């Protein structure tokens, strides 16, 4: 995206440096001055952005955290939406591209529960043939998933003006 849109900044955020390596290498080789990377835990993201500083978020093939009790780690969980709400501009979009049906449905449910505005909702984005930019940009992982004949889903939404409601933590039962 940084190649095509020179007048905007793009910042990749991940805790694992190896996932950002290729992008950083390309940005250096092509002298893309509008591309940067943060190797941080996502829970610390508020340290790096001021209120209203971010125009848009792209969440591309994140860990879906499918094991029991791990949904709170999904990047579209209300606790993260509440964080994003603190630095996104009003009306800014959050975009999720994933091969995980569970994460996709979780996100749809969360978006509905939080009264977010849905701009685009696409199941199996490649079902009707080639897709337009920027959805046509494929990551390494997306290529692997497509080779496995997995369906790629996409949702784009905006957060509501009212604060995101974070559900209470579930108590463990019987010492579990």
Question: Where do the protein language model's features map onto the residues?
Answer:
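Conserved class I S-adenosyl-L-methionine
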Residues: 66-71, 95-114
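Conserved SAM/SAH-binding beta-strand->alpha-helix loop
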Residues: 16
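Conserved SAM-binding loop
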Residues: 12, 37, 96
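S-adenosyl-L-methionine
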Residues: 23-59
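Short beta-strand element of Class I
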Residues: 1, 8-11
């Amino acid at each position: 995206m940084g190649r095509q849109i020179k007048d905007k900044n793009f910042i990749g955020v991940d805790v694992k440096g190896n996932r950002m390596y290729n992008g950083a290498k390309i940005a250096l080789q092509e002298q893309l001055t509008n591309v940067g990377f943060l190797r941080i835990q996502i829970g610390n993201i508020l340290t790096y952005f001021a209120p209203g500083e971010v125009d848009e978020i792209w969440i591309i093939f994140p860990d879906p955290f499918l094991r029991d009790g791990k949904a709170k780690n999904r990047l579209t969980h209300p606790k993260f939406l509440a964080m994003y709400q603190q630095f996104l501009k009003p009306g800014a979009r959050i975009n999720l591209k994933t091969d995980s049906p569970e994460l996709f449905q979780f996100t749809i449910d969360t978006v509905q529960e939080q009264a977010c505005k849905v701009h685009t909702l696409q199941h199996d984005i490649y079902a009707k043939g080639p897709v337009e930019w920027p959805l046509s940009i494929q990551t390494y992982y997306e290529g692997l998933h497509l080779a496995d004949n997995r369906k790629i889903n996409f949702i784009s939404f905006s957060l509501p003006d009212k604060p995101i409601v974070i559900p209470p933590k579930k108590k463990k039962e019987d010492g579990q």
